[in-house]
Amino acid sequence: MATSVAKYFLLSRCSGIIRSVTLQGKLPPVCIRNSQCPSFSYGNRASDNPQDGHVNIPVDRLTVSYSRSSGPGGQHVNKVSTKAEVRFHVYTADWIPEDVRQKIILNNKNRINKAGELLVTSEQSRSQQRNMGDCIQKISDIIAKATEKPHEPSAEDIALRASRLEKRNKERLKQKKLHSAVKQTRRVCFD
């Protein structure tokens, strides 16, 4: 039942307004205008074309479960299952490119269980739908982080690093000679 609720209704809070979004198998791409509005698509941030590396997160491939949230709240927190737990099998997630999948596995070893499922939980809100949206946002952030390419240093950066290394080495040798000279002056000659 939790999966069907997640599949058809998602309440997301954008600029204080709660709206219902009907989902048809895949989550629609939503742009972030503020930090409260989740994005369900990801792409290569360095590219100019937003369709490059664009992958939607299919809701039907996610396993969603709800449980009791921890923390203060009295009777409400003890009665209502609002903590959302979203998981999916990383090794068979064909909607994620292979190199990104390997990077996710490498970077999130503590979130992957023995069955090979990436587990993401959220209990920030008192609403199941908001916690579900937060979990999907976390998955999107994990995938976006794994999608980012490492920064390639320019020739100027390499030259700057080499000059700093050379300067540091000269300073180290200078300090070494000073220390040696101080020790030389402390020696007593018994001749």
Swiss-Prot record:
Domain of life where this protein originates = Eukaryota
Protein location: Mitochondrion
Recorded GO CC terms: mitochondrial large ribosomal subunit; mitochondrion
Targeting presequence: 1-34
SUPFAM superfamilies according to UniProt: Peptidyl-tRNA hydrolase domain-like (SSF110916)
What keywords appear on the UniProt entry? Answer: Hydrolase, Mitochondrion, Protein biosynthesis, Ribonucleoprotein, Ribosomal protein, Transit peptide
> Pfam families this protein is in?
RF-1
What processes in GO biological process is this protein linked to? mitochondrial translational termination
Its EC number is 3.1.1.29
**EC top class, as a word:** hydrolase
How this chain assembles, per its entry, is: Component of the mitochondrial 39S ribosomal subunit.
Family of this protein = Belongs to the prokaryotic/mitochondrial release factor family. Mitochondrion-specific ribosomal protein mL62 subfamily.
- State the name under which the record lists this protein: Large ribosomal subunit protein mL62
Specify the species: Salmo salar
